[in-house]
Amino acid sequence: EDPTRYTEPFSTYMENLETFIRVARDHSAYPVLITPLERRCFMDEKHLGIGAHSDYVAAMKQTAEKNNVPLVDLYSMSRMELKKAGEKNSRRWYMFFPEGEYKNHPEKSEDNTHLRYDGAVNFASMIARGLRELGGIYADMLLDDINL
């Protein structure tokens, strides 16, 4: 792997998050950390494997606590949603489709990371719910429910 493409979860990643937090606060912003979305990593129809981001999630949670920054745990919410949907039904949220399904993307795709529109809306709604649950300034930034 190319070491310029990643950081170590419990060192440079945490340092980078703390830099973002400090810069946000220095500019009178209200930082909030949002854990990464889980990838589709099913071992069978209903059981997810250990996610690729689990160390980064733990590091982010530690950073949030240490720096007194609110956190939306999208990782846990998305894991629960994936387990509920199951391996087959969760494909509809990700770039997972057969050859010829899309004119602009005619080849087959089994991408368990990137989202289709429905997946983006589904997981973004979890972030909105998490921000609403934080209350205060975070909830105040949200629009009332709208139909997409």
What are these regions (language model features)?
Residues 144-148:
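A short, charged, Gly/Pro-tolerant segment at domain boundaries
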